[in-house]
């Protein structure tokens, strides 16, 4: 499976995971105008506005073990900037508490074999 297709499959699996837990998906692959950041998923659970970074890997690869480590401080800062831009452009969501989550999806033969979800994986404090 090509890397982009693998990533999209992981994002779809994560969106379904969130929907099954009562969230609704606000945006997929949100890219603020004039910015380089892309937010994989934005969802809402009624209390929090979830900005979800999805990392998808093939089972059996070295990178599958440490997918969550791929969300570096630099990547966290880009996610934060994208989230700020989203909230500026969508004031109807400012009543929700933002939360930054990470989903690690492992796939084998075009199917999800594991989905680990880390709510509040990092915080905005100290990154501004």
Task: Give residue spans per PLM region.
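Acidic-basic catalytic patches of nuclease active cores, encompassing PD-(D/E)XK
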Residues: 1-30
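Conserved catalytic cores of phosphodiester-cleaving nucleases, focusing on short active-site segments
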Residues: 39-62, 79
């Amino acid at each position: 499976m090509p890397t982009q297709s693998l990533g999209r499959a992981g994002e779809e699996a994560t969106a379904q995971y969130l929907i099954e837990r009562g969230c609704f998906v606000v945006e997929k692959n949100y890219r603020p105008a004039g910015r380089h950041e892309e937010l994989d998923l934005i969802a809402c659970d009624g209390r929090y506005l979830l900005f979800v970074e999805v990392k998808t890997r093939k089972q059996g690869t070295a990178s599958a073990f440490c997918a969550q480590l791929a969300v570096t401080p630099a990547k966290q800062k880009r996610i934060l900037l994208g989230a700020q831009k989203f909230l500026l452009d969508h004031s109807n969501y400012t009543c929700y508490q933002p939360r930054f989550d990470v989903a690690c999806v492992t796939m084998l033969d075009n199917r999800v074999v594991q989905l680990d979800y880390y709510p509040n994986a990092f915080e905005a404090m100290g990154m501004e």
